[in-house]
Structures are given as structure tokens and as C-alpha cells.
UniProtKB/Swiss-Prot annotation:
Homodimer. It catalyses: 5-amino-1-(5-phospho-beta-D-ribosyl)imidazole + S-adenosyl-L-methionine = 4-amino-2-methyl-5-(phosphooxymethyl)pyrimidine + CO + 5'-deoxyadenosine + formate + L-methionine + 3 H(+). Its cofactor is [4Fe-4S] cluster. It comes from Pseudomonas putida (strain ATCC 47054 / DSM 6125 / CFBP 8728 / NCIMB 11950 / KT2440). Catalyzes the synthesis of the hydroxymethylpyrimidine phosphate (HMP-P) moiety of thiamine from aminoimidazole ribotide (AIR) in a radical S-adenosyl-L-methionine (SAM)-dependent reaction. One of its GO terms (cellular component) is cytosol. Keywords: 4Fe-4S, Iron, Iron-sulfur, Lyase, Metal-binding, S-adenosyl-L-methionine, Thiamine biosynthesis, Zinc. The keyword DNA damage does not apply. This is Phosphomethylpyrimidine synthase.
Amino acid sequence: MTKQEKAINLSESAQVDQQSVQPFPRSRKVYVEGSRPDIRVPMREISLDDTPTDFGGESNAPVLVYDTSGPYTDPDVIIDVRKGLPDVRSAWIEARGDTERLEGLSSDFGQQRLNDAELAKLRFAHVRNPRRAKAGANVSQMHYARQGIITAEMEYVAIRENMKLQEARAAGLLNEQHAGHSFGANIPKEITPEFVRQEIARGRAIIPANINHPEVEPMIIGRNFLVKINGNIGNSALGSSIEEEVAKLTWGIRWGSDTVMDLSTGKHIHETREWIIRNSPVPIGTVPIYQALEKVNGVAEDLTWELFRDTLIEQAEQGVDYFTIHAGVLLRYVPLTAKRVTGIVSRGGSIMAKWCLAHHKENFLYTHFDEICEIMKAYDVSFSLGDGLRPGSIADANDAAQFGELETLGELTKIAWKHDVQCMIEGPGHVPMQLIKENMDKQLECCDEAPFYTLGPLTTDIAPGYDHITSGIGAAMIGWFGCAMLCYVTPKEHLGLPNKDDVKTGIITYKIAAHAADLAKGHPGAQIRDNALSKARFEFRWEDQFNLGLDPDTARAFHDETLPKESAKVAHFCSMCGPKFCSMKITQEVREYAAKIEAVDVTVEQGMREQAERFRQEGSQLYHKV
């Protein structure tokens, strides 16, 4: 530890990022209660102004939106990152009676870190003893689902996905939505707990929720549910502190990150992860091989199954919800990458490829896969089967190495399912638009509809600094085709470690992609927010336009750059067209004129009817004597 690190006592000094705890404008946190009082599902309600009288003068109902920000945006909750978030799930877990509280950490490395006095100032102070399944028990959500059990987590996500659709339907808000094309997905009109159970039992969806992460607000990943996004954080050997990573977490979930992966490769990985999990209301994923490699000083050849196994247990007992495991990088596939333009670009994939070649043995993650499953089901950690041979350039898309690994991931999925372990599949990468659907179709075929989770894909390689856009295009497409979760890409992709601003930009870009996919699939209620914003735009309700958007702050700032006065917030124009050429304003004038013409037409028509009646009463004579 450096002198500066020794001087910092995080258990005394750590503070929440103040930007992350500000409520959104005109929004309030609401909770929908389930069948028991401790099932309280958070949503964000956006209040709207009334329609101005010159537009008809009507009230506008509040709009509910999916909320990933956890307690951070609830003004009634006092946030102290030194103590972690409120417990959501412990009562549910204890009631099932199939877990036990351990006397202490069971991983060698975890015990070693705990006994290192020098780390005391960096360590999260309020660590619980971990839970584990009782001997012979399986505590995965898939196992419960296959036993016909609807867990509290399943009911929670059903309420969360449903977003009070029944009320919206009764109000007629679902009538104004285009029909979608879902490419074979089976999206019901209402998400019920039983439907959630069926999807998890079938393997088409997962609820990543480790029994040692009781702070998590359950969410679901699957093609028949809302498209989700993941944001990456994590330190590197070149920088970032524990506080900075926790700030990135809280910042990311504020803007809509459904899950977060901690990809730390620098110092204090164990301690950083503990702070992140204890303060995260969303599932946390990791790539355990990264930390295992740090334990052998970066020498891939020195990795062993025993070391990796201890790392899995260490992270599972901290509460990691899903592991990226690169078990599909087989020895026979490595030569297939030799003629690629960019070779193997996955860090985990390259680590395992190097190990295989150095020992001329099969990937130990593959040969020990059943043993990995035994660990996963003891803590309910979900698999995210890594695509270690994903293409790193569009020239390498859809090649033999990529699809060979995908077929192996399909085999491993079936093994995981035999253990009742939840599983999703990671995908590319760099893929031109015309080849994206082939990726989705092949994944559905090989992996029997297990959820697909892709990095983009990037649709062109010519835009360093703008790869959030090149990948957002591919993400929207593959989300429409059936991808369940999209891993964000920031503007710093290929260039450097993202900061807070980059994290926000990446998340907003991917929220756009995911929402566009939901619209295209015809997900019930997906268009409600669009319709509300469009109506506000037409009625020049500027504040409502800002607040209904994914990023109210940026929308308001852009508007105020040229029209900063408060009076501009009620003006019937913006600086793009000015008062004379605003198409919305002109349309309103056309409507008013048409209404007047229509009124004149009605008067003329009424007069003509009266004259016709008089003509008949007078005998229908064309001429009368004077």
C-alpha cells in the first residue's frame, strides 16, 4: 500500500456520490406491493403539467418508468455507503430453509485478505458471514422454478416487468401502439409470476440473485421480457480508487444500468468488489479469471483449477450474481484464429488460449465444468458463458472460431441446466449489420433459447471515439431480433478507461437501443412514454419534454444554451426554427384555421337545410306568383 492509501480510512471517510442521490425532476419513487408486505417493487413516477387551454386544456396522467436506481433516488432513505444498502431479500432466503450461515469465509484467499491488518482501512466494515446451500440442496431460482415453486423473487420481477399494465390498459394507453414483430418471441399481454416461473424453468430467462447479495432488487433477463443493459466498471493497474468505482456504480444505475460488471484488474480487487456489492441494488457480474490471473502475477501458464476454484468460492461468498466463464475456448479452436485480422480480443479468451497452448491441454474450465456447476448452485450464481473467441473486427465476424465456440457453449448450457443452474450466453463483438441476424438465429438454435447477452455488436470499425454509436446501432438490431441483454460500449472503447461522463453516455446510448428494440418487438406498454413525450412536444410543454426523456439534464441544458430565460419554457418555438418557422406551431395554426372553416361549413350547411325545408313547405314550386 502507498502512503496515501494508508492514510485513507474508507470506513470513516467514504461518502456517496452526491450527483447520484438527487431525485429526478418532477419524479417520485413509488412502490408497488406484492402478496406480502416485504415485496415492495420500486418504480419512478413522472408528473406532467396540464395541457394548455389553447390546446384543449386537459390533465395528463403521470407516466411510470422502470427504475434501476435503487434507494439512491428515494429521499426517504438515508444513504451511507459505509454501511451498505438496506436488506431486501434475507427474509425470503431464510424462509426457504435450505441455506445455512457459515462461521466465516471458506475461501483461502478471502481469509488471507481478512487477516491482513494493513487492509483494515480499505475494508468494508460491515461484512456478514456468508450463506451457502445446506448439504445436498440446490438454491437456484431455476431449481425452485422446476419444482413448481413461485419464489418472492419471481413475483417481484413479474410486478416490475408489468409496470401496472392493467391500469394503463384500462385507461386506453395501450391502444395507441404500433404492432411489433418479435421474431418468434412469446411476449404475453400481462407478465404474471407463473409466466416468470415457466420461463426460468425452461431456461429462457434468468434472475441473477446470489443468496449473499440480499441488497439486490430482483430483475429478469430473457427475450420475452424488457431488453436489459449492462454497464461495466472496474479499476486497472493504471488507476482508479474504491470510492471512484462505487461512484461509477451509483452513477450508472441512476441512468438505467440493469446490471453492472466489475472488471477490476488493478489493486485491491477483493476489497473493491465488497464495497460495490454491498452498495448495489442491481446484480453484479465478474470475470473471475481476471482476479485469478492477478493471483499468479499475470502469468497465464501458472493458473490452476484449484486456484480458480478458490476464486469462485471467494466471489460467490461476497455475493457476485453472475460469473463470466470462458469454458468454450477449446484447444482445437485456437488455431482457427491464426488468420484473423485481430486474433483473440477477449481478455478471458486470450488467457485461456495461452494456458491451453502452454500446457497443450484442454481448457480446465471446460474439463471441470460440472464442478463449477456444483459451486454455482450452492450460492445461486448464474453463468454468463463467455465468448472468448468473439470477433474483434468486422472482417472476423461469423467465422469458424466464433461459431465453433458458440456450439460448445450450447453443449455447456445443457450441462448447466442438468444441474438446474441459470445460464446466459455472451455474444459479439464486431459484426456488420447484414450478419447480425445470423448471430441471433444461430445462438437460439445452438443454445436452445438461453438468454443472449452481447457487447454491441459494433457495426463498423472506422469510428474510434464514437464506438458507443457504432455499437448502439448493432445493439438495437440484435435486441429486436431477440437478444435479452446488451452490454454497453462507451466512447472510450479501444482507447482508455471510461470516466463518469463516459459511463453515462454509454448507458444512455444503450437505453435508447434497448427501448427501440422493445418498441420494435411490440412489448406491451413500450410506447406509452414515447406518446406522452410526443404530446408534450406538440403542446410546447418544455419541462415535460425534458423530464420524460432519458436524460432530462442534457435536454434542458441544450435548450437553455440559446433560450435560457424561464419564459422560453412556455414559448411555442425553440431556437432550431424560431417563432416564424416552427412546424409544430404552424400545424397548430393550420388546425385552428381548419376548425374555423369547419365551423363556417357547418353554418352554411345548416342554412341550406333550413332553406330546403322551407322550399318543401311551400309546395316545392320553383316559381311563385307575385
